[in-house]
Amino acid sequence: MSFPKYKPSSLRTLPETLDPAEYNISPETRRAQAERLAIRAQLKREYLLQYNDPNRRGLIENPALLRWAYARTINVYPNFRPTPKNSLMGALCGFGPLIFIYYIIKTERDRKEKLIQEGKLDRTFHLSY
């Protein structure tokens, strides 16, 4: 039984298991991968020791999660790229509600003023004539 030759899709990159570069790597690259794996395993072990400590007090601080949250929330402007869509959404969200509320108040006052001038509105508690 023969299998058809794998044809890579134009929409997706080649899987690592089918990439020839995965198996033909230099010793330096292998050493760097092993060092990264060792660091990752050490950090995971430290985290699990803190997580499963029965005498734990307070929260466990994950430095990677703190860096991610800082970059995501507090440090927005160095990573922000202004586009026409961002500008339009900012203008709509900033000035849109103000213009909408102004329009509602203005039309309501104009309608009331017109009714007062025609004498159709009963003003029982008016302060001025």
From Swiss-Prot:
GO molecular function terms noted in the UniProt entry: NADH dehydrogenase (ubiquinone) activity
Keyword annotations: Acetylation, Electron transport, Membrane, Mitochondrion, Mitochondrion inner membrane, Phosphoprotein, Respiratory chain, Transmembrane, Transmembrane helix, Transport
A GO BP annotation: proton motive force-driven mitochondrial ATP synthesis
Pfam family for this entry, one: NDUF_B4
GO cellular component, one term: nucleoplasm
Principal cellular location given in the protein's record: mitochondrion
Modified residues (Phosphoserine): 26
UniProt record similarity statement: Belongs to the complex I NDUFB4 subunit family.
Quaternary structure and interacting proteins, as annotated: Complex I is composed of 45 different subunits.
Protein name: NADH dehydrogenase [ubiquinone] 1 beta subcomplex subunit 4
Organism: Homo sapiens (Human)
Gene name for this UniProt entry: NDUFB4
